[in-house]
């Protein structure tokens, strides 16, 4: 395949992954900051141990901070223009690795409350993130001159 086409595909794949995770964590984290703890949160998690430790408010804000950190990492990757040939995708890979832990947090809450459909969805997000991380690590290295 033509090396210019390969570089375009690499850049497009990394940019799309970067923008997707920037969007996912940006909307999730910023909406939590803007709206605060939702009214349903106590009803869903109030009967779990999370109500005692670390507490529902702390649980909500720890999740929010986790999402905002993923958003910030994705933002740094985009600002560094890691999707271009000259840059290794260090912050993009960090975004994806951290996202695995955020999806783990989200999935834990779903499984804890016996929301098995939600838990399965988080499992699929986790799996998709693993695929994205593999792609970013595989194509995320700068192209070598021949």
Language-model segments: what does each one mean?
Residues 33-55:
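Membrane-interface interhelical connector segments
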Residues 1-31, 60-65, 69-146:
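Extended, low-polarity transmembrane helix blocks
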């Amino acid at each position: 395949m033509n090396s210019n086409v390969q570089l375009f595909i690499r850049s497009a794949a990394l940019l799309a992954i970067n923008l997707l995770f920037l969007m996912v964590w940006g909307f999730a984290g910023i909406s939590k900051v803007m709206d605060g703890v939702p009214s349903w949160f106590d009803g869903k998690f109030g009967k779990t141990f999370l109500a005692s430790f670390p507490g529902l408010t702390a649980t909500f804000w720890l999740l929010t901070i986790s999402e905002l950190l993923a958003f910030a990492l994705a933002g740094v990757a985009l600002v560094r223009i890691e999707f271009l040939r000259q840059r290794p995708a260090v912050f993009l890979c960090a975004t994806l690795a951290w996202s695995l832990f955020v999806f783990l947090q989200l999935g834990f809450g779903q499984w804890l409350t016996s929301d098995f459909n939600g838990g399965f969805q988080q499992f699929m997000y986790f799996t998709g993130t693993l695929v994205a991380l593999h792609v970013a690590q595989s194509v995320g290295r700068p192209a070598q001159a021949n």
